[in-house]
Design a protein with these regions (language model features):
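Sequence/structural signature of beta-propeller domains
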Residues: 1-117
Length: 117
């Protein structure tokens, strides 16, 4: 829920998350002590949901994961990862400015991402 530009109110967010990504990086002997090589990323602010599986409302047709922190990213199998957010703080709100967030887990099918080298 974005506030109209240049306004601050209690029923909307004036500073929305714009950048949330899960990166796959190369960890090898070749880059020890140097920069990591980015292999790919998943944009958590633009998650396609063509089968309408999300239990949270879509934003312009996509699921967003706007939380301040991402608590975990785990590989489930060769095609899936789970991304989780533990919203255990009573004043944590990223979806509705006047309501504490639920804990959320997303199971994402990202086989090509996981296979990328």
């Amino acid at each position: 829920k974005a506030c109209p530009e240049a306004t601050k109110r209690t029923d909307c967010f004036h500073d929305l998350a714009r950048f949330k990504r899960v990166y796959k990086v190369e960890l090898s002997e070749a880059n020890v002590g140097g920069p990591l090589r980015k292999i790919g990323y998943i944009d958590l602010m633009n998650i396609a949901d063509p089968n309408k599986l999300a239990r949270k409302p879509l934003d312009n047709g996509v699921l967003t994961f706007p939380f301040f922190t991402i608590e975990n990213v785990d590989m489930v199998d060769a095609r899936h990862i789970v991304v989780g957010n533990d919203n255990n703080l009573p004043f944590s709100s990223s979806r509705d400015p006047n309501k504490a967030d639920d804990n959320e887990l997303m199971l994402l099918e990202v086989g090509d991402f996981l296979k990328a080298r």
